[in-house]
């Protein structure tokens, strides 16, 4: 269902799954599973679940829709004929393939969906990530020069976590593949570290055992990031030797952040200059920090 792949134990009676529980003996998840996975049995047994292709028998303008079950062979033949007609009339890019989230986690469905796109000749491929996380691959390609690298923060060794916009208690931190997200936050605090959430509201994830919230005006995160970089540079916390080995255009970055001092971004972010300097200092002084 989602990429943490929390292990579940299924109870089976008379060949039917009757209950799903967390795998409490799993060494990674340690018995964690969110309600999405635990309640998936309701999806599996839902009487309205579609288990066979359905062909609409009345016009789309008529509501409600009326459907008739057809065989898989009939469905494939009909869909294939229609797709070929579209491609012949309008070219291959008139067809696009959309990957839903579960497809990417299915070892059979993913290569078949990719093959469908390749056989159609279309260059248009979309997924749940297109509308949900397209900014991340774009940033990764800009920073690392490839789309094939997706770094994930090493929370297990972090002493400081600066979390922009994340709500791990609610979202379970998609794209980080974390089990037990709140326990991970508590572990950081438990070893003397600190978690600071940057969010427009006081989120459910923040409490005395996980971390604190610094309220920010919506859509102003980039200005806060620029001001933090400004302070890190001003206080000599750029590791220029490491940057020289792994990066480039440091002068360009410095020219960009020079105009965004904490005082300059206070109005647009709603965060006072001293708090911004404190965040930069916390991040810079931490033995190991993550964003």
What are these regions (language model features)?
Residues 90-94, 238-243, 290:
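Flexible, glycine/charged-enriched surface loops at secondary-structure junctions
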Residues 45-50, 230-260:
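Scaffold signal of the M16-like zinc-metallopeptidase fold and its non-catalytic homologs
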Residues 228, 246-291:
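Active-site phosphate/pyrophosphate-binding segments
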Residues 104, 216, 241-245, 253, ...:
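A general boundary/transition motif marking the beginning of the first structured unit of a protein
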Residues 1-235, 264, 272:
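N-terminal export/assembly segments and adjacent metallocofactor-ligating motifs
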């Amino acid at each position: 269902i989602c990429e943490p792949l929390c292990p579940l134990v299924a109870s089976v009676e008379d060949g039917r799954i009757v209950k799903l529980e967390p795998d409490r003996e799993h060494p990674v998840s340690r018995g964690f599973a969110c309600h999405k996975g635990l309640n998936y049995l309701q999806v599996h047994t839902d009487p309205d679940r579609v288990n066979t292709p359905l062909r609409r028998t009345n016009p789309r303008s008529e509501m409600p829709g009326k459907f008739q079950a057809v065989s898989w062979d009939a469905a494939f033949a009909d869909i294939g004929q229609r797709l070929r007609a579209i491609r012949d009339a309008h070219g291959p890019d008139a067809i696009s393939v959309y990957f839903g989230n579960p497809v990417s986690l299915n070892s059979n469905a993913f290569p078949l969906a990719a093959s469908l796109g390749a056989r159609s000749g279309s260059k248009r491929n979309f997924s749940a990530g297109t509308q949900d996380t397209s900014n991340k691959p774009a940033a990764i390609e800009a920073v690392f020069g490839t789309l094939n690298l997706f770094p994930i923060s090493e929370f297990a060794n972090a002493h400081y976590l600066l979390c922009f916009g994340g709500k791990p208690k609610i979202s379970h931190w998609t794209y980080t593949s974390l089990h037990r997200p709140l326990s991970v936050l508590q572990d950081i605090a438990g070893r003397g570290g600190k978690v600071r959430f940057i969010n427009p509201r006081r989120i459910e994830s923040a409490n005395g055992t996980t971390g604190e919230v610094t309220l920010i005006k919506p859509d102003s995160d980039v200005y806060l990031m620029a001001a933090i970089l400004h302070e890190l540079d001003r206080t000599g916390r750029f590791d220029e030797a490491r940057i020289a080995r792994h990066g480039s255009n440091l002068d360009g970055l410095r020219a960009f952040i020079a105009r965004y001092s904490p005082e300059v971004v206070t109005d647009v972010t709603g965060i006072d200059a001293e708090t911004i300097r404190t965040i930069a200092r916390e991040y810079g002084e931490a033995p190991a920090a993550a964003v």
